[in-house]
Amino acid sequence: MAGKGEGPAIGIDLGTTYSCVGVWQHDRVEIIANDQGNRTTPSYVAFTDSERLIGDAAKNQVAMNPTNTVFDAKRLIGRRYSDPSVQADKSHWPFKVVSGPGEKPMIVVNHKGEEKQFSAEEISSMVLIKMREIAEAFLGSPVKNAVVTVPAYFNDSQRQATKDAGVISGLNVMRIINEPTAAAIAYGLDKKASSVGEKNVLIFDLGGGTFDVSLLTIEEGIFEVKATAGDTHLGGEDFDNRMVNHFVQEFKRKNKKDITGNPRALRRLRTACERAKRTLSSTAQTTIEIDSLFEGIDFYTTITRARFEELNMDLFRKCMEPVEKCLRDAKMDKSSVHDVVLVGGSTRIPKVQQLLQDFFNGKELCKSINPDEAVAYGAAVQAAILSGEGNEKVQDLLLLDVTPLSLGLETAGGVMTVLIPRNTTIPTKKEQIFSTYSDNQPGVLIQVYEGERARTKDNNLLGKFELSGIPPAPRGVPQITVCFDIDANGILNVSAEDKTTGQKNKITITNDKGRLSKEEIEKMVQEAEKYKAEDEEHKKKVDAKNALENYAYNMRNTIKDEKIASKLDAADKKKIEDAIDQAIEWLDGNQLAEADEFEDKMKELESLCNPIIARMYQGAGPDMGGAGGMDDDTPAGGSGGAGPKIEEVD
């Protein structure tokens, strides 16, 4: 529970391509805009020669710096380097990914002139820090507690890794909840007043990078997830890619040139395509104009909504398959679905809406909640509930989540014996008794798997441990109780106990899956602090540089001013001019100097200019006509000017 004085708890939708943050305030959810005024923030982190950028600033410079701009960290989090999906993704990314210790994928970038490696958790933690800062700027107070969302499809290790990212960012992650569940909460709150009896709601979440379909029942504020399905690799980016490929071909036809080898050209084209896609959701055609795209050739073209739909038709149709699977899993007919809820920016595409509406025989779709914000909205509500913030309005909302995959262990012959079937409401606990397979067997190997296949080799091994010290006995005699226990965050504990001897062993499914150790997390928390300090150091530097620049240019303008120039002694004027020229020249050559160097230069310049200007004012006598008022735009002596206050400001 959130202690008092920790500020309100926030809800964060940590997305593959964009993230969003909300907070419960004044009896409602507030989705918070960032410093650029955007209510969603790109999940991008960029490293440059001089600084680290997160969010819009990172995404905006991606064309200039593609190899050191990291995005899609969510596609790596909690996975192994050898995972086929990591290998497939790797080929599409401009940044480099290598295998680190324990097969953990590490992202390689150049930062401040040296090579650095970051895990997906660290990159995600930087995005989380950004989201937290956005909330803190809005609330005006520190934020410690958060609810963070993940796709329903995420397995145990991906959930753990997301939690770790929270820890590294300095947040207390009160709970990890499924994105569709969060959207359902947002929706349930909207609809609560009118609802009577049980409602079946299908949540169709087509985001930038992932696609989730979930079926929930909502009754009197109780949400239950009946089934989930989806595709971890389908989303807005895929639609962008289709358009990019289309235009790459067009460029080839028109200009006989292939731009695929040029990351910057591709990136500029992709940015234009993303913009065009958004436009085509509200207009029938749009133009793309990119100056000097490749080898000085301008690329001007148009695309119609019909053409965009044709390029993506197979993908749009593919979106309907998980809908059918979800209904099958929940043993429900599509006519029993009361509401179909759209989540994720890509659900704005008219064709997607039309296909979905046709599938549900013309049923109206729920679009009352901004699809980009629904998940963060629900997370913010959940955060309010968990921290006891909200009023009666939210307190009686209860949330039942489910396991996305069946959990079980391997029994003789490589058979998957399921203890917890998929779509079981969590938290949950199941026990089952097993025995030995051969006479006098001294121990058993408990191998924990997740997956839907009958044989363990086709499923995903979560972890294993041994229970030894079983006294000699004929096969089938010893009784070994195996217990599977999943908590509210979907984190699994498996224990085994030999009934006769009381021998016990257990595993928390975390470490064997590339989970970060305590030490690693500690180290990363310190790194995060270090980067924050560096970022602040950099800001200090920039501020000091700007102060010096402003002072020099203001002073130059001051002495150009007729009224003032006429009062200046020629030698003094020359002295000031030379000093300013020298300062500006020094600035040009030392853009990356340290803050104190800028400050020293500033003091030098001031100690020369200020006395001269002050003398001029005193010499002018009372009849100079409001000389006092000149303070506003002249860098006057002492503390009147913008300059000397630097140390006090920081």
UniProtKB/Swiss-Prot annotation:
Domain of life of the native organism: Eukaryota
The keyword Phosphoprotein is annotated on this UniProt entry: no
Phenotype upon gene inactivation: Abnormal embryogenesis. Defective seedlings with high levels of reactive oxygen species and monoubiquitinated LHCB4 precursors. No visible phenotype under normal growth conditions.
Organism taxonomic ancestry: Eukaryota, Viridiplantae, Streptophyta, Embryophyta, Tracheophyta
Disulphide linkage map: none
UniProt-listed InterPro entries: ATPase_NBD (IPR043129), Heat_shock_70_CS (IPR018181), HSP70_C_sf (IPR029048), HSP70_peptide-bd_sf (IPR029047), Hsp_70_fam (IPR013126)
CDD domains tied to this protein: ASKHA_NBD_HSP70_HSPA1 (cd10233)
Entry protein name: Heat shock 70 kDa protein 4
Organism: Arabidopsis thaliana
Similarity-based family: Belongs to the heat shock protein 70 (TC 1.A.33) family. DnaK subfamily.
Subunit architecture: Interacts with CHIP. Interacts with HSFA1A/HSF1.
One Pfam family from the record: HSP70
Primary location recorded for the protein, binned into one broad class: cytoplasm
